[in-house]
Amino acid sequence: TRNSSVKTPGEKSKNHKDFRAGVLQDMNKCKLFQDFANGSRKLSHDELFGIATNLIQVETGTKYFMEKRLEYPNIYPDDAKNEKWEAHLSYMEQNNYYPQSCDKYCPYHEECTHCKNILSTIHTKRRSMEKIAGYHETFYSMEEMQEDVYDAISRAFRARGKKFYIIKAMTGAGKSHSYINLMQEYSDSRFLIAVPTNLLKGEIFKKAKELGIEVMKTPSLEAIKDRIPPDIWKRIQRMYQEGRPYLVHPYIQKELTKKEIPCLRKYMEKRERLKAWDGCVITTHRYLLSMDQERLDEFDSIIIDEDILFKSVISNQGEISVSDLKKLKKKTTDPRLSKKIKKLLKASETQSCIKVEAFEWDDDGDKKSMPFDIPSFCLTEWFYLRRCENEENLVEDVFAFLKPADFPGEKYIMVSATADEEICGWYFGEDNIDFYECKKAEYMGELKQYCEKSMSRSCLNNNKGMVGKLMNRFGMCPNNTITFMKEGIGPLHFGNTEGSNMLEGKDILVVGTPYHAEFLYKLAAISMGIEFDEEEKMSLQTIDHNGYRFQFTTFQNKELRKIHLWMIESELEQAVGRARLLRNACTVHLFSNFPLHQAKMIPNFNFEEGHGM
């Protein structure tokens, strides 16, 4: 039987050792190594042997080992044994012993977070993905998982109290199936279901109708935009962009008195029917956020499908350039608006994260076009100044902000595969949420992940044609490939994957680690009341996530990092989730250096020769 501590004859020795002497300074992160280095106790032979197999991989490591034994003669007094250890170390070096696993000899291995051995724990190499020892996920049967999801939603439905009941469940775990069944079971209750997209709205509406549920879906102008006269659609879009949606329907009514536009006539008729409707309603996140308390109080239960923070709050940004803001200050007759702009401009001389008082803008109904969404600007407290000196694509400084989102309802239930308890607590308030993570089941299909390259936008820019090469390698067509929109491949890309079932049960290729601009993470953080150094930039960090220790470009600040990783993971999980691996024996090939749950890491993938597939 082969000794796993010894390299085979075919494995090459190196002139230089794998680790430089500087690593010795970090070895004290290991509790057992501290015992050895500080002479706090006598180590057993097995403990010393384990440490030695790690130290021989380090320049001057052998010398360090012997120096420490000689430094503590009261613990290691036997000169003969010291001579034996010198011989042992020489033999181990000559035979290229591997660093021994912590689990085999360390008495502390169950109480610390460690990787395979001391070296991989304290010094994670770039492009490596070190599995954290002892990390495991508990899986249940599909039936247990589905039952748990239904029970969680049912409990939240019956619960009393003004709270956000947040239920995290895997993609494909039966979230929509569960709440539709609940709608059928409690047919006397009025449910308001909000989903991310019109596409998903139609799908949920159809499923509910097939079960005989009394339900309507909110009409959408976006869904009929191709049939609306271009000049009218352009005017409608501008009203929304200006933050004046309340002008849209009076404008449509006025246009319908001038000429007959069938699609708009039908849209307005559906709106009128909806007003008088007393059954269940399926709508979108955006529509939900526009509903006032009086309208929301008509419903017995509000269920939000998917993470509304990620999909519809943080993604709903506004911005205005400094020059446009100065022009607005000169033109406005509203003293409160003028004062707010003045404070913002003054603070921007020394700050990037700026807080100014919010107020509700009095719209006089003037039909003149506005330069941007003034109502949202007035209601916003936190702004982030994007400086053109720090961003290549900016021609001048710009104030960015998240458009305020209101949740005036009595109780909300959110079901999502990507919701994060800590982030929900920051946004809604820790005392205002009730968070439950459902049981998980193992994938029926397979998620293969290739993590040697970051596959960020800049990585793909430096490796032109990479996505096309990978498509050829795995025999993927554009429809089965998800990557950045800029690549121009297929109908799905990062940012628009939710709610699509076109790839269910199919082998797919996902390429990319979807970073956003740094300002967005900071903007999200200040909007949640998080304090941080606004000058901090992303840098290479060693992090632990999803059972792996690896190097990743992110923030040092823990809260900023949390938001950053949550957004990346949410986007990747949505993309991978299109194949519905939980219920289908298909394969997803993921090229990203961010590890996902249940991923099988494929090492040493050769991008030139196809080795490793």
Placement of each model-derived feature along the sequence:
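ASCE RecA-like P-loop NTPase motor cores
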Residues: 125-613
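Modules that initiate DNA replication and primer synthesis
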Residues: 4-128, 178, 193-195, 503-511, ...
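Extended, Lys/Arg-rich, non-catalytic nucleic-acid recognition/anchoring regions
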Residues: 1-7, 333-336
